[in-house]
Structure formats: C-alpha cells, structure tokens
C-alpha cells in the first residue's frame, strides 16, 4: 500500500497555513482545514491519479482542496510525495 510522504517545503507550508488560519479565523477553522487535508490524503491513497496533471514531464499532479488552497504531489515508487501546499490568492 502506498504511503504519504511530505517534503520539508510542503510540511512548512502546511504548518504556516495552519498558523495563519488560527490567527485570522480561530481553532474551528484550523480543525476544518486540517480535517479536509487528511480526508483528501486518505482519498489520494486509494486514487493516486485523482488530481490534474500539472507538469507532464515531472508527473506532478495538483488538486484544489479549497478555492484558496492547492496541493501539488507526485506518485513515485509506491509512495505519494506531497510537494507543495499553497494559497491560490
């Protein structure tokens, strides 16, 4: 079964985004956002080609988690690597 692996940049972006949401909107928003991310990751384990192909040569896929947030990932050797999580605004 595939595993989810976060690179350092994506992990920091996720943490920074959680911190921003906490400061601006409160704990409930952070909980909702975090839940949405991990629900998506569970779905991604079952359907790794769920996102749209953003970079064909590097086989990088993207998925809009929320109108303001996109996650970029790549499947490689049975693992799914989270490459970036960023604000679309």
Place the predicted regions along the sequence by residue:
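Arg/Lys-rich, positively charged N-terminal/basic patches that mediate binding to nucleic acids
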Residues: 1-32
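A general structural signal for well-ordered secondary-structure junctions
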Residues: 27, 47-50
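Extended, folded domain segments that form the structural surfaces/walls around functional sites
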Residues: 33, 41
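Short proline/glycine- and basic residue-enriched helix-capping loop/turn segments at helix->loop/beta transitions
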Residues: 42-46
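Basic/aromatic recognition patch in beta-strand/loop cores that engages polyanionic ligands
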Residues: 49-79
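A beta-strand edge to alpha-helix "cap/lid" segment located at domain peripheries
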Residues: 76-88
